[in-house]
């Protein structure tokens, strides 16, 4: 488990940030050697603001190109700046595609990955004859006809506790591939927009994008809704559909239970 800091207990406080970002220009959340990330920008700007080395820990390490309305990060600091004021000062330093929605002090032993939580992701699809430029960074474009009823039927079969190994990127190192999905909704918004909304207690690497790719296959008639059961039973990545592109995915909400 990652440690937040080695600062003396009496001198530090722990601060939780709610972070929104457009992931288009970033190599994901986690620090990488080959590009700028959300985590590296937060560390850089917090270190500059608080005049001490700061390293944040993120609740969800989103992939390159994925967006967020409410990811969570925490860090320790000895600064006397009130926790609730940090959001205002930090937003003055961050790039315009990253914004802190809230900053607050939390108990010193609070850690985002040790808490029971509920995450909600949305995968957005734009269906039309031609692409819409203003949606190109946040929705997957398709000109295929999609049978939404078939997608909704298949989505319901994913709900509950299952072994989602077939929906996990090959090579991912995890102790268990069992997860609980509270709900999977396929919702039409207007004539052209379609949203796949998935809520669960945790997700495997690329799991939501593989779910989206599989539901798209079903919507196009390439698979039957009942194939979900066969895919789950296979426990093999090759049994599921393709991994949908990252730019259609947004982490909408992170709730601690």
Regions found by a protein language model. Give the residues of each.
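Structured-RNA-binding interfaces characteristic of tRNA pseudouridine synthases
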Residues: 1-257
